[in-house]
Amino acid sequence: MSGLSESAKLVKDALERRGLETPMQPNLATPAEKKEKIEQHMREILNLLGLDLTDDSLEETPQRIAKMYVDEIFSGLDYANFPKITVIENKMKVSEMVKVKDITLTSTCEHHLVTIDGTAAVAYIPRGKIIGLSKINRIVRFFAQRPQVQERMTQQILVALQTLLESDDVAVTIDATHYCVKSRGVMDATSVTTTTALGGIFKSNPATRAEFLHGLR
């Protein structure tokens, strides 16, 4: 962890202490080594499925998938990619709720490795610190860019912001369509899953909780 930013270390440690970290094992492979191995194995999988990898439409597919996994949709497994966070002193004495909603979220179901597609809303009550608004979106994206279950992802975003803001007063909700439900199994194309994680005053004060949740309608 020596190469990680202080923010990344704090968030990772907080999630591990709470048992909320994504199940991972130590991996010292470089990104290039990971891509090489994934490409090899993906080539084997596609061959087993009977696809002709000499066809010009398919010949680069194993390489494309390897690059996509490491650099894009699973990049959140590597805390070296944790966003640079700007947290500043609340000199303006802002004390009312700050809420960002309709944050676009695309993740991957860890059970079937298919898409989770939805939106997130995040709110916090400023105390001693405030955070740059775009950083909230970037934190959501970081935790979305890994194999996930929605319940855990919601909690991870909550704990990350609580840790960085040094305040429990954070709320997170996610509405998402799961393609493991939509494109296979029950084949339900219209259902949406909602998960919510509340901390501090959002959990203890019904009026604050209602202000957050009702403002999402």
UniProtKB/Swiss-Prot annotation:
InterPro entries: GTP-CH-I_C/QueF, GTP-CH-I_N, GTP_CycHdrlase_I, GTP_CycHdrlase_I_CS, GTP_CycHdrlase_I_dom. GO terms for molecular function: GTP binding; GTP cyclohydrolase I activity; zinc ion binding. The keyword Nucleotide-binding applies. Its EC number is 3.5.4.16. PROSITE patterns: GTP_CYCLOHYDROL_1_1, GTP_CYCLOHYDROL_1_2. GO terms for cellular component: cytoplasm. The keyword Metal-binding applies. SUPFAM superfamilies: Tetrahydrobiopterin biosynthesis enzymes-like. Toroid-shaped homodecamer, composed of two pentamers of five dimers. PANTHER family: GTP CYCLOHYDROLASE 1, GTP CYCLOHYDROLASE I. This is GTP cyclohydrolase 1. The lineage of its organism: Bacteria, Pseudomonadati, Pseudomonadota, Gammaproteobacteria, Vibrionales.
